[in-house]
A protein has these predicted regions:
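Short acidic/polar capping segments at secondary-structure boundaries
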Residues: 27-29, 58-62, 91, 117
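Short, well-ordered alpha-helices that flank and scaffold nucleotide-derived cofactor binding pockets
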Residues: 76, 100, 104
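Active-site/ligand-binding-proximal alpha/beta "capping" segment
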Residues: 48-89, 146, 158-173
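Active-site/ligand-binding loops adjacent to catalytic centers
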Residues: 35-38, 45, 50, 104-177
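Short glycine/serine/threonine-rich phosphate/pyrophosphate-binding segments
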Residues: 1, 6-11, 88-99, 178
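Receiver (REC) domain switch/active-site residues of two-component response regulators
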Residues: 20, 83, 150
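Active-site-proximal loop->helix
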Residues: 1-44, 122-140
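Generic beta-sheet signal
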Residues: 1, 24, 56, 112-114
Length: 178
Protein backbone atom coordinates (compact mmCIF):
# COMPACT_ATOMS: atom_id res chain seq x y z
CA UNK A 1 0.00 0.00 0.00
CA UNK A 2 1.75 3.11 -1.24
CA UNK A 3 1.00 6.64 -2.40
CA UNK A 4 0.33 6.82 -6.13
CA UNK A 5 3.19 9.31 -6.35
CA UNK A 6 5.78 6.54 -5.87
CA UNK A 7 8.24 5.98 -8.68
CA UNK A 8 7.72 3.44 -11.42
CA UNK A 9 10.83 1.63 -10.15
CA UNK A 10 9.26 1.07 -6.73
CA UNK A 11 6.07 -0.17 -8.33
CA UNK A 12 8.02 -2.65 -10.46
CA UNK A 13 10.01 -3.85 -7.45
CA UNK A 14 6.83 -4.57 -5.46
CA UNK A 15 5.32 -6.39 -8.45
CA UNK A 16 8.57 -8.33 -8.94
CA UNK A 17 8.24 -9.69 -5.39
CA UNK A 18 4.78 -10.92 -6.31
CA UNK A 19 2.93 -8.58 -3.99
CA UNK A 20 -0.38 -6.95 -4.76
CA UNK A 21 0.23 -3.22 -5.16
CA UNK A 22 -2.47 -0.93 -3.79
CA UNK A 23 -2.01 2.74 -4.64
CA UNK A 24 -3.62 5.51 -2.60
CA UNK A 25 -4.14 8.86 -4.31
CA UNK A 26 -1.70 11.52 -3.12
CA UNK A 27 -3.81 14.66 -3.26
CA UNK A 28 -0.83 17.02 -2.78
CA UNK A 29 -0.58 16.18 0.94
CA UNK A 30 1.78 13.30 1.61
CA UNK A 31 0.92 13.26 5.33
CA UNK A 32 -2.77 12.61 4.71
CA UNK A 33 -1.90 10.05 2.05
CA UNK A 34 0.43 8.16 4.42
CA UNK A 35 -2.33 8.19 7.06
CA UNK A 36 -4.75 6.72 4.53
CA UNK A 37 -2.19 4.07 3.53
CA UNK A 38 -1.79 3.07 7.19
CA UNK A 39 -5.55 2.98 7.78
CA UNK A 40 -6.00 0.80 4.71
CA UNK A 41 -3.27 -1.56 5.91
CA UNK A 42 -4.79 -1.82 9.39
CA UNK A 43 -8.24 -2.59 7.92
CA UNK A 44 -6.73 -5.30 5.74
CA UNK A 45 -4.87 -6.80 8.73
CA UNK A 46 -8.11 -6.93 10.74
CA UNK A 47 -9.84 -8.75 7.89
CA UNK A 48 -7.03 -11.12 6.91
CA UNK A 49 -4.70 -12.87 9.40
CA UNK A 50 -2.09 -13.26 6.63
CA UNK A 51 -1.61 -9.48 6.41
CA UNK A 52 1.30 -8.16 8.48
CA UNK A 53 1.73 -4.44 9.16
CA UNK A 54 5.28 -3.66 10.36
CA UNK A 55 4.32 -0.23 11.75
CA UNK A 56 7.79 1.11 10.94
CA UNK A 57 6.97 4.64 12.17
CA UNK A 58 6.34 3.37 15.72
CA UNK A 59 8.09 -0.01 15.88
CA UNK A 60 11.15 0.18 18.21
CA UNK A 61 12.77 -2.65 16.22
CA UNK A 62 13.31 -0.15 13.40
CA UNK A 63 15.95 2.05 15.11
CA UNK A 64 17.24 -0.96 17.08
CA UNK A 65 18.36 -2.79 13.94
CA UNK A 66 20.24 0.34 12.87
CA UNK A 67 21.84 0.60 16.33
CA UNK A 68 22.94 -3.02 16.42
CA UNK A 69 23.82 -3.51 12.75
CA UNK A 70 24.04 -0.51 10.41
CA UNK A 71 25.70 1.80 12.93
CA UNK A 72 28.13 -0.93 13.98
CA UNK A 73 28.98 -1.69 10.33
CA UNK A 74 29.79 1.98 9.74
CA UNK A 75 32.07 2.09 12.80
CA UNK A 76 33.85 -1.10 11.71
CA UNK A 77 34.33 -0.07 8.08
CA UNK A 78 35.35 3.57 8.39
CA UNK A 79 39.07 4.02 8.91
CA UNK A 80 39.48 6.72 11.53
CA UNK A 81 37.09 8.88 13.51
CA UNK A 82 33.68 9.82 12.14
CA UNK A 83 33.02 13.54 12.41
CA UNK A 84 29.59 13.78 10.82
CA UNK A 85 26.57 11.85 9.61
CA UNK A 86 23.69 13.00 7.42
CA UNK A 87 20.39 11.18 6.90
CA UNK A 88 17.01 11.82 5.39
CA UNK A 89 14.07 11.37 7.74
CA UNK A 90 11.36 8.96 6.71
CA UNK A 91 10.41 6.60 9.51
CA UNK A 92 13.11 8.04 11.77
CA UNK A 93 14.71 4.63 12.29
CA UNK A 94 17.91 5.21 10.33
CA UNK A 95 18.92 8.57 11.78
CA UNK A 96 17.90 7.52 15.30
CA UNK A 97 19.63 4.14 15.37
CA UNK A 98 22.78 5.04 13.45
CA UNK A 99 22.97 8.46 15.08
CA UNK A 100 22.82 7.05 18.60
CA UNK A 101 25.48 4.45 17.79
CA UNK A 102 27.85 6.96 16.19
CA UNK A 103 27.30 9.54 18.94
CA UNK A 104 28.14 6.90 21.57
CA UNK A 105 31.46 6.35 19.78
CA UNK A 106 32.15 10.08 19.32
CA UNK A 107 29.95 12.43 21.37
CA UNK A 108 31.42 15.46 19.56
CA UNK A 109 30.35 14.38 16.08
CA UNK A 110 27.62 16.28 14.25
CA UNK A 111 24.47 14.77 12.81
CA UNK A 112 22.29 16.48 10.22
CA UNK A 113 18.74 15.58 9.24
CA UNK A 114 17.41 16.11 5.71
CA UNK A 115 13.85 17.00 4.71
CA UNK A 116 12.33 17.66 1.28
CA UNK A 117 11.41 21.29 0.67
CA UNK A 118 7.73 20.44 0.17
CA UNK A 119 7.39 18.29 3.29
CA UNK A 120 9.67 19.99 5.82
CA UNK A 121 7.43 19.32 8.81
CA UNK A 122 10.28 19.17 11.35
CA UNK A 123 11.39 22.61 10.19
CA UNK A 124 7.90 24.02 10.55
CA UNK A 125 7.13 23.91 6.84
CA UNK A 126 3.92 22.88 5.16
CA UNK A 127 3.17 19.42 3.87
CA UNK A 128 2.82 18.87 0.16
CA UNK A 129 4.01 16.45 -2.50
CA UNK A 130 7.62 15.93 -3.52
CA UNK A 131 9.79 13.52 -5.49
CA UNK A 132 12.12 12.35 -2.70
CA UNK A 133 10.52 8.99 -1.97
CA UNK A 134 11.22 7.45 1.41
CA UNK A 135 11.68 10.70 3.31
CA UNK A 136 9.40 13.60 4.17
CA UNK A 137 6.28 11.53 4.81
CA UNK A 138 4.44 14.42 6.44
CA UNK A 139 4.50 12.96 9.95
CA UNK A 140 6.86 13.20 12.90
CA UNK A 141 7.56 9.52 13.63
CA UNK A 142 7.16 8.30 17.20
CA UNK A 143 10.52 6.51 17.05
CA UNK A 144 12.46 9.60 15.90
CA UNK A 145 14.97 10.86 18.47
CA UNK A 146 14.75 14.59 17.72
CA UNK A 147 17.67 15.28 20.05
CA UNK A 148 20.14 13.26 17.97
CA UNK A 149 20.62 15.79 15.15
CA UNK A 150 22.01 19.32 15.40
CA UNK A 151 20.52 20.80 12.27
CA UNK A 152 18.05 20.13 9.48
CA UNK A 153 18.83 20.67 5.82
CA UNK A 154 15.93 21.34 3.48
CA UNK A 155 16.53 19.96 -0.01
CA UNK A 156 14.71 20.91 -3.22
CA UNK A 157 13.69 18.08 -5.55
CA UNK A 158 15.84 19.50 -8.35
CA UNK A 159 18.89 19.58 -6.07
CA UNK A 160 18.31 15.97 -4.98
CA UNK A 161 18.00 14.80 -8.59
CA UNK A 162 21.10 16.71 -9.68
CA UNK A 163 23.15 15.34 -6.77
CA UNK A 164 22.09 11.74 -7.45
CA UNK A 165 23.07 12.17 -11.10
CA UNK A 166 26.46 13.62 -10.10
CA UNK A 167 27.14 10.75 -7.70
CA UNK A 168 26.33 8.26 -10.46
CA UNK A 169 28.46 9.91 -13.14
CA UNK A 170 31.44 11.00 -11.01
CA UNK A 171 31.61 8.35 -8.28
CA UNK A 172 29.73 5.38 -9.74
CA UNK A 173 27.32 5.46 -6.80
CA UNK A 174 23.85 4.51 -7.99
CA UNK A 175 21.66 5.94 -5.24
CA UNK A 176 18.18 7.35 -5.22
CA UNK A 177 17.33 10.99 -4.67
CA UNK A 178 16.37 10.60 -1.03
Amino acid sequence: IMPDSVSEERRKLINHYGAELILIHDDNNIGECIDECLQTAMRMAEEDPNVFVPQQFINPANPQVHRSHTGQEILEQVDGPIHGFCSGIGTGGTITGIGETLKAANPDMEIWAVEPEHAAILSGGSIGSHLQMGIGDGVIPDILNQNIYQDIYIVKDEEAIRTAQELASKEGIMCGIS
